[in-house]
Regions:
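Alpha-helical transmembrane segments in multipass membrane proteins, preferentially the mid-helix core
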Residues: 177-186, 243-256, 298-312
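Alpha-helical transmembrane segments of multi-pass integral membrane proteins
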Residues: 50, 133, 201-211, 237-240, 242, 271-379, ...
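C-terminal ends of transmembrane alpha-helices
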Residues: 56-62, 148-149, 206-223, 273-286, ...
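Hydrophobic, membrane-facing alpha-helical anchors
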Residues: 148-156, 237-250
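Membrane-cytosol interface segments of multi-pass membrane proteins
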Residues: 1-208, 260, 311-312, 319, ...
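Interfacial loop-to-helix transition and helix-capping segments at the boundaries
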Residues: 79-92, 158-173, 212-243, 277-300, ...
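Alpha-helical architecture
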Residues: 43, 54, 172, 236, ...
Length: 394
């Protein structure tokens, strides 16, 4: 009898210990606020995708849009020109969202090893998408001269090293970001400040000084050295945006704009218009992206918050967000020798832009016919067409 009582007490102690551990784990998770949910992530990716299409299609200097009628001039103000300049921030937006999303994804893991496993899986998944799309577009590219049928071209395309289709350059950058991601996230995980704005301001100041150095360094000579130099500073732009995304997740900056208090509405309005004014008026030249990493969270977080509160808009941007990777890889083929004659049918700039969205979305659905079952199989879900009309959720 006494032995039975002792066994029961021992079992109760184990249950209590397990329950206490579980409660402590839950408390740790709850202590890390996450105002930027998966729902917000899909909306933000949708916003970034549509900015990407607009900037690439309607920016000044493109030869393929010279025949588009610019109906977006109001009282002498060229809305098309300045909106295309502002939407240049889309490239930094992708790096920002990568940092924010990876922080939420990797912070739950305990070891660097587990973090790298997750990163490798993410990159392999992205390459699967890339290869499937490459198979679809390569035959047409041979006819139009975009690709050549030789070993060097094929190998460079397979590994996204170099290729005339410039939209693939982000593959190299994303790989580099994944290499550094676990280290940065582990570092930020252990840093704790009562005043969250102090480390943010210090970080911005250091990055801004480093970025300005480029204006005073001139590299000439070997083309490989020049290429590596440009690659380094391009990567610097995106590693900064990536780190800003980590900071936004670490300090829950989204809560500033999702707060139920009335002040959050005014913060959002001020932040959006300030970012537009700075990008379009204070930055000299469309290609000068020295402070885009500063502007991206000022615009992307509040605009995402606004959209999330409207059912129709949130559904639309969520749909685009689920196809964001396909959008990145596919949209360029409609204005780069592939189907420019089809894209130009509406004649007017805004209609051509809407038409590009429709064409890219239809193409993404077609790609997903092959892509979805492959990714499901890789994820040990078997071949099925569940989610046929949606991009695979991470």
């Amino acid at each position: 009898m006494e032995k039975t009582i002792k066994n029961i007490e021992s079992k109760n102690e184990k249950d209590f210990s397990t329950e206490t551990t579980l409660i402590n784990d839950i408390k740790k998770l709850n202590n890390h606020k996450q105002s930027f949910s998966l729902f917000h992530t899909q909306i933000a990716k949708g916003v970034a995708s549509l900015m990407l299409l607009y900037h690439h299609l309607l920016r000044e200097g493109n030869t393929f849009n010279k025949d588009f009628k610019n109906e977006l001039i109001f009282f002498g103000f060229n809305f098309r020109k300045y909106s295309a300049i502002f939407f240049k921030i889309t490239t930094c937006s992708y790096a920002f969202l990568s940092g924010l999303g990876l922080y939420y994804s990797l912070i739950k893991l305990n070891s660097i090893k587990d973090m790298y496993k997750k990163c490798i899986k993410n990159f392999f998944r992205l390459f699967i998408i890339f290869w499937i799309i490459l198979i679809f577009v390569y035959p047409k590219g041979l006819k139009t001269g975009l690709f050549n049928l030789n070993y060097s071209t094929i190998i460079s395309c397979i590994f996204a090293v170099y290729h005339r289709k410039g939209n693939w350059w982000y593959m190299r950058m994303y790989f580099a970001l994944l290499v550094y991601a676990p280290l940065f996230i582990r570092l930020f995980k252990d840093i704790s400040y009562k005043n969250k704005f102090i480390p943010i301001l210090i970080f911005y100041l250091i990055c801004f000084i480093i970025r300005i150095i480029k204006n005073y360094i001139k590299i000439t000579g070997n083309i490989i050295i020049i290429f590596l130099y440009l690659e380094y500073f391009t990567f610097l732009d995106f590693i900064i945006s990536f780190l800003v995304g980590i900071i936004a997740a670490k300090y829950d900056l989204m809560s500033i704009f999702t707060n139920t208090k009335s002040e959050s509405f005014y913060y959002s309005i001020f932040s959006i218009f300030s970012s537009i004014f700075i990008r379009c008026n204070l930055i000299t030249g469309e290609g000068d992206t020295r402070i885009d990493y500063f502007i991206v969270p000022m615009f992307l977080l509040p605009i995402t918050s606004f959209i999330s509160k409207n059912k129709v808009l949130s559904n639309f941007f969520t749909l685009i967000g689920k196809h964001s990777v396909n959008f990145w890889f596919l949209h360029g083929y409609f204005y780069d020798n592939y189907y420019l004659n089809i894209l130009s049918l509406p004649k007017y700039s805004s209609l051509c832009y809407i038409w590009l969205i429709i064409l890219t979305l239809i193409s993404s659905y077609i790609i997903n016919i092959v892509l979805v079952p492959i990714l499901n199989f890789i994820n040990n879900k078997g071949f099925n067409y569940k989610g046929f009309f949606h991009f695979i959720k991470k």
